[in-house]
């Protein structure tokens, strides 16, 4: 079979993924539920994974890493936790429904929303984000890269603008994590989400 949809969901997983799933089913206990060996081993593995992810994204510490069922839940949690009625949010037309739908729902409850369009080259400049910021802006929510246009946003520049204006910066890295560098501290990112579905060796072998 010739598979052309890797940009949506990676088809072939590394052999280590299948082995890890098998090992987990056969050997791991319930993390946090007991002091027996299998449970303690599960807890250690979870924490070690947090350490690896924190190192990959240069986060503020492994205790800040949260495991959720998918990127949609992670993005919804960040959006619902950081954005309240009366706030203004800047986002883009490049976003996945996991960003746009909760933001449109927030709009119905009193959140003001600015959706930045693409230019003729399929890009959105960092200046466009800066120009969209208002006195009541609370957050910028954007993707890092699009698997539709193949373009990536300059998170450094957008993050600098967020820092200057004291804004929350929420990033959907589902298309870029493990492929493009992401430095949460240097980019002033408050929350970043990713999914393993589109990752190859980099994230699947953590």
Q: Which residues does each PLM region occupy?
A:
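Pyridoxal 5′-phosphate
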Residues: 1-201
């Amino acid at each position: 079979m010739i598979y052309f949809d890797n940009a949506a969901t990676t088809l072939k997983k590394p052999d280590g993924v299948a082995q890890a799933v098998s090992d987990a089913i056969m050997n791991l206990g319930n993390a946090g539920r007991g002091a027996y060996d299998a449970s303690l081993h599960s807890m250690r593995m979870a924490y070690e994974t947090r350490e690896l992810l924190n190192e990959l994204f240069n986060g503020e510490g492994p205790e800040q890493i949260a495991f959720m069922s998918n990127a949609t839940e992670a993005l919804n949690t960040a959006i619902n936790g950081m954005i309240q009625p009366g706030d203004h949010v800047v986002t883009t037309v490049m976003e996945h429904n996991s960003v746009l739908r909760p933001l449109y729902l927030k709009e119905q409850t009193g959140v003001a929303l600015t959706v930045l369009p693409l230019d003729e080259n399929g890009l959105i400049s960092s200046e466009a984000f800066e120009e969209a910021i208002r006195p009541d802006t609370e957050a910028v929510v954007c993707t890092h890269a699009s698997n539709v246009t193949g373009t990536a946003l300059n998170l450094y520049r957008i993050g600098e603008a967020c820092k200057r204006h004291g804004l929350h910066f929420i990033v959907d890295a589902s298309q870029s994590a493990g492929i493009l560098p992401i430095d949460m501290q240097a980019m002033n990112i408050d929350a970043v989400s990713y999914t393993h579905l589109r990752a190859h060796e980099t994230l699947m072998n953590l």
